[in-house]
């Protein structure tokens, strides 16, 4: 790790500390993720190293680039391109003010492009949330930590014992489904889309059952009619309260009808009926010309404050 000089600690991710660091030779700024794993004495599993090495091949403008993997003794460092802010911090730094709809549209389109690319390479994220969506002053948004779940699993708690958020977790996972599909990421994107519009988390649950019930209260309790096979999922209970669905107009009143339609398709209960990232990119919501220079200008102003 002598190549890198740590500049400052910038956060604590799911798997370990993240540092802003500088390449001593080139001066390039990088994000250095130190992976802390509760491992047996042998150190880092070779399967994890294999999985992670594959991620270096994921090259896309909306994916945070994994530049290098440095593995010594029982430590694993992942070297990523550096971006100065995540979407959560960005939204928290502009409380009360709404994000312009053109910026939301631009961010959503870019997120779907990144997710579509990863899904086409058979990589599922499984833990998308505003904290791992990184933005820069040029109006770009990039997905971080893609593929780490497959290498390391998604723990219930971070290495500092914080609970890993459930707010963006798909209902099939909450109901105990053992089979993950790319649809779990689409659900998360739906939650993030709504949060960008309303500036409030859509389903801020504090336990798995609270998380499920918040979803049911808003979208109605699922049944075999709305989600064939739901009653067979391991954690489904016939005794769940029966809530009826609310209209999306109540939830995202200031979103245009095409946006509401797309949100509805992102938040489909049945994973097999949930829209894919690729199909979502062709949705009429995106057909109006994208004023990205305006989006860029807006972000730039915010970065200067």
Swiss-Prot record:
* One Gene Ontology term of the molecular function aspect: ATP binding
Q: Does the keyword Transcription apply?
A: no
Report the GO terms under cellular component. Answer: cyclin-dependent protein kinase holoenzyme complex; cytoplasm; nucleus
Catalytic center residues: 127 (proton acceptor)
Q: What is its EC number?
A: 2.7.11.22
Ranges of residues in domain Protein kinase:
4-286
UniProt: ATP binding residues:
10-18, 33
| Source domain of life | Eukaryota
Q: Which InterPro entries match?
A: CDK, Kinase-like_dom_sf, Prot_kinase_dom, Protein_kinase_ATP_BS, Ser/Thr_kinase_AS
Q: Which reaction does it catalyse?
A: L-seryl-[protein] + ATP = O-phospho-L-seryl-[protein] + ADP + H(+); L-threonyl-[protein] + ATP = O-phospho-L-threonyl-[protein] + ADP + H(+)
Tell me the PROSITE patterns matching this sequence.
PROTEIN_KINASE_ATP, PROTEIN_KINASE_DOM, PROTEIN_KINASE_ST
Tissue localization of expression is: Expressed in cancer cell lines and glioblastoma tissue.
Mention one GO biological process in which this protein takes part, according to its record: negative regulation of Notch signaling pathway
Quaternary structure annotation from Swiss-Prot or TrEMBL:
Interacts with CABLES1 and CABLES2. Interacts with ATF1. Binding to CCNC/cyclin-C promotes RB1 phosphorylation.
Protein's job: Serine/threonine-protein kinase that plays a critical role in the control of the eukaryotic cell cycle; involved in G0-G1 and G1-S cell cycle transitions. Interacts with CCNC/cyclin-C during interphase. Phosphorylates histone H1, ATF1, RB1 and CABLES1. ATF1 phosphorylation triggers ATF1 transactivation and transcriptional activities, and promotes cell proliferation and transformation. CDK3/cyclin-C mediated RB1 phosphorylation is required for G0-G1 transition. Promotes G1-S transition probably by contributing to the activation of E2F1, E2F2 and E2F3 in a RB1-independent manner.
Q: Which family does it belong to?
A: Belongs to the protein kinase superfamily. CMGC Ser/Thr protein kinase family. CDC2/CDKX subfamily.
Q: What is this protein called?
A: Cyclin-dependent kinase 3
UniProt gene name: CDK3
């Amino acid at each position: 790790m002598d190549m890198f000089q740590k500049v400052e600690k910038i956060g604590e991710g799911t798997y370990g500390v993240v540092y802003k660091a500088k390449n001593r030779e080139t001066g390039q700024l990088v994000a250095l993720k130190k992976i802390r794993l509760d491992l047996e004495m042998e150190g880092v599993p070779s399967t994890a190293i294999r999985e992670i090495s594959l991620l270096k091949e994921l090259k896309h403008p909306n994916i945070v680039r994994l530049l290098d993997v440095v593995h010594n003794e029982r430590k694993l460092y992942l070297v990523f391109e550096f971006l100065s802010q995540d979407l959560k911090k960005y939204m928290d730094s502009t409380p009360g003010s709404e994000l312009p709809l053109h910026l939301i549209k631009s961010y959503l389109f870019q997120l779907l492009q990144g997710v579509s690319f990863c899904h086409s390479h058979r990589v599922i994220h499984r833990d998308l949330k505003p904290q791992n969506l990184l933005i820069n002053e040029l109006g770009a948004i990039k997905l971080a930590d893609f593929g780490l779940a497959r290498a390391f699993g998604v723990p219930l708690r971070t290495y500092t014992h914080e609970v890993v958020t459930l707010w963006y977790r798909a209902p099939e996972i909450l109901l105990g489904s053992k089979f993950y599909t790319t649809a779990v990421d689409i659900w998360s994107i739906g939650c993030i889309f709504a949060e960008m519009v309303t500036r409030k988390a859509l389903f801020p649950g504090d336990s798995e059952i609270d998380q499920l019930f918040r979803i049911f209260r808003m979208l109605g309790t699922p049944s075999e009619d709305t989600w064939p096979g739901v009653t067979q999922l391991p954690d489904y209970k016939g005794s769940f309260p029966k809530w009826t669905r609310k209209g999306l107009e109540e939830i995202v009143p200031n979103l245009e009808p095409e946006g509401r339609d797309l949100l509805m398709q992102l938040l489909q209960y049945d994973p097999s009926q949930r829209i894919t990232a690729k199909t979502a990119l062709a949705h009429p919501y995106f057909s109006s010309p994208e004023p990205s220079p305006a989006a860029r200008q807006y972000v730039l102003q915010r970065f200067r404050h």
